[in-house]
Amino acid sequence: MKRIAVALLVVVAILIGQALPKISSLWAQPAASRAPDATASGQIYAKTYGGYEFRALSSDLTYGTQGTGIYATSVPIKSFRLALSLPNGAQVLTATIFLVDNDPVNNMAVHLISYTASLTTSANIATADTSALPNSPAVQSISMSGSPLVTLDNNSHGYAILYQPIITGTAHMLVGARLEYTLPTSILALP
């Protein structure tokens, strides 16, 4: 019995010894898989949001979900909003919205807006719509771009992507959004 216990301990020790390099490699990433140097000038970053991250601005706007998409089940004069969470001073270059527009009559329009902290005023920065897209049940994309579209001033404004549904059902569905942006030099200089 002692021999079996000793043999079992030896086998366990060997297995642990073989597993340790594998476990430690989880923490040590090779240089090729690490994020690029944040101090690189002109580096373009991207932040991706799922459709489920859009929020109804009113409880009157009811909605359903399908996969990662969100769609209206009622159409009051209310909107879905995706609040942007990017660093102060970030320059938004492109906002790409992933959506489904399978309605032959109505187009979808999406807005990039700024608003004051008190939510008393807002301003439209850019708009994109689906008028140039074919009707399709497949996920498609529309984009707003500029050089930059906007430089974020989080001290005095909030920023969001806004969509006001005009029909109900999955023929119009938000699936996600991706923002491409650069960071200000002051953030890049941090250790």
Placement of each model-derived feature along the sequence:
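Extracellular carbohydrate recognition and processing domains
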Residues: 122-150
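Exposed low-complexity, polar/acidic, P/S/T/G-rich flexible segments that act as propeptides
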Residues: 166-191
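Noncatalytic modules at the cell exterior or secretory-pathway interfaces
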Residues: 147-169
